[in-house]
C-alpha cells in the first residue's frame, strides 16, 4: 500500500484515539494527549521489556501494545471490548508488520482470567502449564477511572501476572489530597470532577497505592510520576451549594510501576482477608 492509499484508508476510519507512527511520515490522527503519553513513557522506562510476555488491557488502537513489541517483548497480547477499535488495530499491525502482537477481542477487564483461558487454550493447546498462562508485564493504562469496580480489575490483573511481574498503571489522580480518598464522579453526566460521562472514580495518590497493595502489589515509589493534565471541566451549575467544596480538588494524571507479590508478603490479617474469594472475587487465588 503506497502512502496516499494508506492515508486515505486511515482517514476513512471514523475515530482514532492513539497517534501511532506507521513510518514513512504517516501518523494516525489521534487525540492531542502527548503530555499524558510522554509522562507514561518516562515511567515505563523503568521496566525492561526484552524477552517478556506483555498483556495490554483495553488496548484501543494498540499504540502501547506495538510500542511494547518495539521495546523487545517476545509476545504481546492486546485485549479490548470496543468493536470500533478493532479495524484500527488490525490495520496498524499490518502496516507495522507486527509479528509478536496479537489482538484478543471482546475481553472485558473484569473477566481477564476466564477469557485469557480461552485464548491460551485455542492458541497453545490444552496441555499448557498453569504458570505459562501468566504474563511478565501487564499494562493497565488510562482505564482505572473508567471502571465502576476498579479494584476488581486490579485483582484480575494480579491474577494473570507472574510473581515479581510488573504492573504499569496510568490513571486520573487527585493531586492535592494527602488523605486516602476515592472520589465518586457521580452518576453519568453529573461530572463532579471530570466532564466525561465515562469517568466513575478518581483516587488520591495514597488511595491508589493502598488499592494496589490490597490487590497484592508492591509500589515501586521511585517510578511514580504525576502532572496536572488540564481537561475541559464542567461548570458546577448542576451541583448544589453544599457541594461547591468539590472544586478544591486538582485533577491530574499519574503513572507508576507496581510489582506482583504473594500473600506471604502481607501481614497475616491482611492476607486472610484479601484471600477470601467472597470478599475479593476478582482475585483468582488458585493461579497465584
Question: Where do the model's predicted regions map?
Answer:
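Conserved N-terminal segment of class I S-adenosyl-L-methionine
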Residues: 1-133, 251-288
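Short N-terminal micro-motifs specific to bacterial/archaeal maturation
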Residues: 27, 45, 129, 141-144, ...
Amino acid at each position: 500500500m503506497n502512502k496516499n492509499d494508506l492515508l486515505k484508508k486511515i482517514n476513512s476510519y471514523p475515530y482514532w484515539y492513539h497517534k501511532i507512527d506507521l513510518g514513512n511520515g504517516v501518523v494516525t490522527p489521534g487525540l492531542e494527549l502527548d503530555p499524558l503519553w510522554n509522562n507514561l513513557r518516562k515511567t515505563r522506562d523503568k521496566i525492561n521489556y526484552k524477552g517478556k510476555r506483555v498483556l495490554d488491557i483495553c488496548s484501543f488502537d494498540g499504540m502501547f501494545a506495538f510500542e511494547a513489541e518495539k521495546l523487545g517483548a517476545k509476545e504481546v497480547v492486546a485485549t479490548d471490548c470496543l468493536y470500533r477499535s478493532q479495524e484500527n488495530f488490525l490495520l496498524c499491525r499490518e502496516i507495522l508488520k507486527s509479528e509478536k502482537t496479537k489482538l484478543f477481542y471482546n475481553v472485558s477487564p473484569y473477566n481477564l482470567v476466564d477469557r485469557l483461558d480461552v485464548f491460551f487454550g485455542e492458541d497453545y493447546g490444552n496441555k499448557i502449564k498453569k504458570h505459562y498462562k501468566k504474563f511478565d508485564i501487564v499494562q493497565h493504562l488510562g482505564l482505572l477511572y473508567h471502571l465502576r469496580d476498579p479494584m476488581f480489575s486490579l485483582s484480575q490483573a494480579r491474577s494473570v501476572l507472574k510473581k515479581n511481574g510488573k504492573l504499569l498503571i496510568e490513571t486520573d489522580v487527585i493531586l492535592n489530597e494527602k488523605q486516602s480518598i476515592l472520589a465518586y464522579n457521580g452518576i453519568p453526566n453529573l461530572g463532579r470532577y471530570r466532564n466525561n460521562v465515562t469517568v466513575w472514580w478518581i483516587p488520591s495518590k495514597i488511595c491508589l497505592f493502598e488499592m494496589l497493595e490490597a490487590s497484592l502489589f508492591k509500589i515501586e515509589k521511585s517510578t511514580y510520576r504525576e502532572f496536572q493534565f488540564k481537561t475541559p471541566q464542567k461548570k458546577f451549575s448542576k451541583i448544589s451549594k453544599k457541594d461547591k467544596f468539590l472544586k478544591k480538588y486538582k485533577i491530574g494524571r499519574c503513572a507508576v510501576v507496581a510489582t506482583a507479590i504473594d500473600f506471604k508478603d502481607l501481614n497475616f490479617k491482611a492476607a486472610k482477608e484479601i484471600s477470601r474469594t467472597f470478599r475479593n472475587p476478582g482475585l483468582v487465588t488458585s493461579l497465584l
